[in-house]
């Protein structure tokens, strides 16, 4: 059934999302066990209902207090994850456009240009943080850029690879889920559409406006089914992830605020 499809997918996304956080923190901040990342990554989904960046801020605070990682440095790791997430979404959106660009609204024709521009920005970005470009600049030495100074070029690609199973599994899940709403679509067709929708919805501007309603545009004649599909898929994913967070909330609070109280007591 639909729930039997969505529940395992949500857990898989949570585990992959936690893996990315664990990998980045261990690269740039401190040695942390994967199982110790799960409580804060899960709990942060509750705050992400309001705003994704608030959730990342909570993770930064947790790692700062629990592992003693300097605030600016762990904040830098959160920025690194956000930076890689943009390139991850853009990479797969480019694949999607290559597969189904002819059937997409004209607003998405900008994706190849965005991809080329982003590639050039990445090259300049890497040259700057390696000290090749503007070698006398002190901007790169600021704590907020700690992760970017430490990063190797392959780290960026590794994060994209680690995240990709989440998107590929989403393609299959959405393909099957759509059939429950009476609409049949192939996996390759969904691979063309879904990354575009994810990228567009995460990007401010005209693409976001169109992406939110793209299901209806892509499947004319099924307006009611597609409106329901987009609404149900999006909201189930957000709220079930928050429910996962509730499982870990007590432990996260205990490790975060309990440790803070112990520190206050020792200072007194």
Predicted feature locations:
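Helix-terminus/helix-capping segments at the ends of transmembrane helices and short amphipathic helices
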Residues: 25, 63-64, 178, 216
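Transmembrane helix boundary and interhelical junction motifs in multipass membrane proteins
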Residues: 15-20, 50-60, 188-189, 198-215
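Membrane-interface alpha-helices at helix entry/exit sites of multi-pass transporters
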Residues: 34-37, 56-57, 68-83, 222-232
């Amino acid at each position: 059934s639909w729930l039997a499809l969505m529940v395992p997918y949500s857990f898989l996304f949570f585990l992959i999302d936690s893996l990315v956080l664990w990998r980045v923190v261990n690269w740039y901040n401190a040695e942390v066990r994967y199982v110790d990342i799960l409580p804060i990554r899960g709990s942060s989904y509750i705050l992400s209902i309001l705003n994704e960046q608030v959730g990342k801020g909570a993770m930064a605070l947790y790692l700062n207090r629990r592992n003693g990682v300097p605030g600016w440095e762990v904040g830098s790791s959160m920025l690194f994850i956000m930076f890689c997430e943009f390139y991850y979404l853009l990479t797969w959106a480019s694949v999607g456009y290559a597969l189904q660009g002819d059937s997409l609204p004209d607003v998405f024709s900008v994706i190849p240009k965005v991809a080329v521009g982003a590639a050039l920005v990445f090259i300049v970005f890497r040259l700057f943080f390696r000290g090749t470009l503007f070698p006398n600049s002190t901007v790169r030495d600021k704590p907020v850029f700690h992760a970017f100074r430490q990063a190797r070029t392959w780290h960026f690609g590794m994060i994209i690879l680690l995240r990709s199973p989440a998107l590929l599994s989403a393609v299959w899940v959405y393909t099957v889920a759509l059939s429950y709403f009476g609409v049949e679509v192939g996996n390759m067709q969904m691979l063309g559409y879904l990354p575009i929708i994810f990228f567009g919805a995460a990007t401010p501007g005209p693409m976001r406006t169109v992406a939110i309603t793209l299901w209806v545009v892509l499947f004319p004649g099924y307006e009611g089914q597609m409106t329901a599909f987009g609404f149900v898929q999006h909201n189930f994913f957000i709220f079930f992830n928050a429910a996962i967070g509730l499982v870990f909330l007590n432990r996260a609070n205990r490790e975060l605020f309990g440790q803070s109280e112990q520190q206050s007591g020792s200072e007194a």
